[in-house]
Structure formats: C-alpha cells, structure tokens
Amino acid sequence: MVQVVEAFGKPHVNVGTIGHVDHGKTTLTAAITKHYGNFVAYDQIDKAPEERKRGITIATAHVEYQTEKRHYAHVDCPGHADYVKNMIVGAAQMDAAILVVSGVDGPMPQTREHILLAKQVGVGYIVVYINKADVSDPDMIGLVEMEVRELLSKYGFPGDEVPVVIGSALKALEDDDGEYGKKSIDKLMERLDDYVEVPPRSVDLPFLLPIEDVFSISGRGTVVTGRIEKGEIKIGDEIEIIGLKATQKTTCTGVEMFKKLLEKGSAGLNVGILLRGTKREEVERGQVLAKPGTITPHRKFKAEVYILKKEEGGRHTPFFANYQPQFYLRTTDVTGSIKLLEGKEMVMPGDNVSIEVELQVPIAMDKGLRFAIREGGRTVGSGVVSEILE
C-alpha cells in the first residue's frame, strides 16, 4: 500500500526552478510566493552576500505556497554552471521541476545540463515557463517553445505533452493584469496542479533520510536536515547514522518542518530531526539516517553509466581503467576509481557502459541508486547502481 502524504490538509508536492543563469528562476519564485504564499522578495531568496554581488544564486532557497488543491514546497536551484554541484542536491528534492527559459535567448548550455540532471536524479515531471515574453516577439517565442520541447524529448521527457506557459515573471511581480503578468502565474499553478501527479510516497518502506545539513541548537542538541526519502519517523524511534565512517545508533527526539513541530515526518517532506546524545561533529552531510538494519554502507558496486558527449558539456577525450572522478551520491561527492569490464579498453564520450566502481569511503547505498560523475567542476556522466559488490 502506498500513501500520499498530506501537509496542511492538502496533498504535498516538492517542486523547484531549474534553467540557465539570468533566465528568471529567482524572479519567478518570488512572483509565485507573492500570489500564492507568504511573499518572499527576490533578494531574500538570493540571500547570501557573496551571491548577490555576482548576481547569481548559489544556495538552495526553500519557500512554500499553496493552491486550492495542493501544498507546494519549492526550491530555487542555483543556475550557474559552477554551482551544478549544489543543484544536484536541490534537484534531488524535486517531484517536478519548473524549467525557466528566456523567450529572448532560448535554451542555453545550462538549460540542457539541468534537464539532463533532472532526468538523472529522478525528477518525474517538468513544466516549462517561457519568461521575458514582454520583451520578446511571438515568432521567437514559438521557436523557443519548439526547441525546448525537442530538447526535453531528447533527454527522455515527454516533450510533446509537457505544459508550456508563456509569461513575464517581472510583470507578475509588479502585479500586472495582462496575459503575461499575474495570469501567467495562475496558469502555471493550474498546470502544476493538473499535470503533475502527486507522487506516491514510499511511506510504508523503512525510514531513510539523506543528510543535507547539520546544526547545533543550544540546549536542545544536534539537528540534521534533509528530505525523507522513504518511510516515516516518530519521536522516540531508534535510528542509525550510516556512511563515511562507522555506523552509529541514536534516537529521534523531535521532528520539525518549516519551524512547526510535527508528531511524525513522512516520505517526501523536508524536515529537521533532533538526535539524542549525538554531537555535532559526529554527523555530516552525505551520511543517511535510517531504520536500524535496513541499509548498509558499501564501497564497491557495479553500475550502468552514460558518459556525456563533448557537445553535451562532457569530456573531449576518452578515459581508461583506473580513471578517478568524483561520484555524487544523494547529497555528497566521493572520489572513486573506475574499473572497466573485460574486453573494454577505453570509454569514449557518448558511450553507455557497465563499470565497476570502488569508492574511497563507504556510502549507504542499494541497487537502483542514481548518481552523477563529475570532474573539474562539470558533469561528465550519469549512472545507476546495478549491483552491490562489497
């Protein structure tokens, strides 16, 4: 039996904005909160000081809003190529993505990379918002829409049926009553409600939460945050902290979401979990919290991987056995060594191959876990664990 989680009395969906730098992701996020949530201004979403100076978003901002039908938690993912690493963490928390594409420029390199990443980290649905329509012309917008649909199909999304909304996030933010203003946000919310199915949550599976961040709250102890991937957790539940170092046991002494205390946390929700007697330095991002005995840490596995072509932003040259890139698994990056299987001398950009990987540190994993392969600040491949070796 699969259960749909409710939040605030409505079905709950995790969404987020993806797309090229300066195409309007953060402006759109602000506009949605203005009309459907508690308004969060552009510069609040774009918070950290060093980010605003460069006019690009590095951190992942969390906001919430609701339609008549649903409650949405929304992450504004970084758009700049240098911050794809962070985006992988953001995208991992999305049931659906709002792909923002400028109607003036059309799809750009990061548009492609974000679509690829969305596919790879298991984002189920994409809804497109063609932005800056007020300063583009209808012919250009038609071309942009065609190009975006083709691109989505190329990366495995149903390009022909993906909803496309045309508007201006800035006009919507300025409360403009025209077609491209607030009405485009209404239309976008309608499309999200109608097109994106509320994902069946794995609440009946054993509890698992990949740790994204760790805080120390004076007088209360250590809190870890992240999105519950499977199962549910209640106060008093025993849990294990797995990966990177020896497995530790602890107990959950509190669950909270958006600063509200919950009786329990269930799959799909972004929560903070208070841990009994655990020191801040004993836990780190990249580990997971799980029901005792349900998942184990491993260093060696077999995987099916796709290595990006040069045109997709991948490597320009082949790689050979013992190549050592970074593997992004859930919320962390770990260096690993690649072993090619018999009869394979080298792997060319564009190849789809079976490989064996040996990580430098153990990570909690099971079959079916997806990951990205990165080097020198860029994605060079994607893969899925096909078999655990040890």
From Swiss-Prot:
Transmembrane found in the keyword field: no
Region (G3): 76-79
EC assignment: 3.6.5.3
InterPro entries according to UniProt: EF-Tu_GTP-bd, EF-Tu_GTPase, EFTu-like_2, EFTU_2, G_TR_CS, P-loop_NTPase, Small_GTP-bd, T_Tr_GTP-bd_dom
Reactions accelerated catalytically: GTP + H2O = GDP + phosphate + H(+)
Class of this enzyme: hydrolase
Keywords carried by this UniProt record: Cytoplasm, Elongation factor, GTP-binding, Hydrolase, Magnesium, Metal-binding, Nucleotide-binding, Protein biosynthesis
Residues that bind Mg(2+): 26
Region annotation (G4) ranges: 131-134
Entry similarity comment: Belongs to the TRAFAC class translation factor GTPase superfamily. Classic translation factor GTPase family. EF-Tu/EF-1A subfamily.
PANTHER family linked to this entry: ELONGATION FACTOR TU, MITOCHONDRIAL, ELONGATION FACTOR TU-RELATED
Record's protein name: Elongation factor Tu 2
Naturally occurring in which organism (per UniProt): Wolbachia sp. subsp. Brugia malayi (strain TRS)
